Regions:
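Extracellular or exported targeting regions of proteins
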Residues: 27-186
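A short, hydrophobic C-terminal helix/tail in secreted or cell-surface proteins
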Residues: 192-203
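N-terminal secretory signal peptides that target proteins for export/translocation
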Residues: 1-7
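Sec/Tat signal peptide C-region and signal peptidase I cleavage site
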Residues: 20-26
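Serine/threonine-rich, low-complexity intrinsically disordered segments
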Residues: 8-9, 23, 116
Length: 204
């Protein structure tokens, strides 16, 4: 493991038809951890296999819509080419629990170079989109496991934050993202970038 530290943000979105959800009704929770091990079955995609384990609770009656892993922050010098070269994954990228209870939901992974317009983010991010069916969809709570590969060895995640955002509402929640991430050859964030580590939630 090298001495670099990586700053990342993970954001999840809940489906909603409301324009605003009150703070009292939206006590959400999200937490994730990334682990790494030498790749033994997909070495053509990268020498290292990374696994993101995620738990969520939207705190409302609205189910998970999708979630984003924000990789590059304002002031950083990573570009889309850096990420395209550094990250690989299979289809589906992962799986989570679903509703009704006992079913499983698969997810597609997308590298979005222009961010997520639903919350006015224009930075590089990895989007995890559920492949829904009439028989199984993500719920208001759940757990998921997602896998990607890289030629770059793991580096500790520094000053992480995890945010759960209602896609059509005003709620933003933050929780811990721990573990490791590929030690990218670029800098995902500027040294003066804002740290969200102590912020639990905010309402715009």
């Amino acid at each position: 493991m090298n001495g670099r530290r990586i700053t990342l943000s993970l954001m999840a979105f809940a489906s909603s038809s409301l324009l605003f959800i009150s703070p009292a009704a939206a006590d959400c929770l999200i937490a994730g951890s990334v682990s790494a091990a030498p790749s033994t079955t997909q070495s053509c995609l990268g020498a290292w296999e990374y696994t993101l384990s995620l738990t969520w609770d939207t705190g409302t009656r609205y189910a998970l819509s999708h979630f984003d892993l924000l990789i590059a922050h304002p002031g950083g010098n990573c570009n889309c080419q850096n990420l395209n070269q550094a990250l690989n994954w299979l289809s589906p990228i992962g799986i989570s629990s679903g509703e009704p209870a006992g079913c499983s939901v698969s997810y597609e992974g997308f590298l979005n170079c222009t961010g997520d317009p639903s919350i006015d983010i224009t930075d590089l991010l990895l989007k995890f989109e559920p492949i829904e069916s009439a028989d199984c969809k993500p719920g208001t709570t759940g757990q998921g496991t997602y896998t990607f590969f890289s030629a770059y060895p793991p580096a500790p995640i520094s000053e992480p934050n995890l945010s759960l955002v209602d896609k059509f509402g005003q709620l933003v929640c933050y929780g811990p993202l721990t573990g490791v991430f590929p030690g990218l050859p670029c800098d995902p964030t500027a040294t003066e970038a804002r740290s969200w580590g102590s912020q639990k939630a905010s309402y715009r």
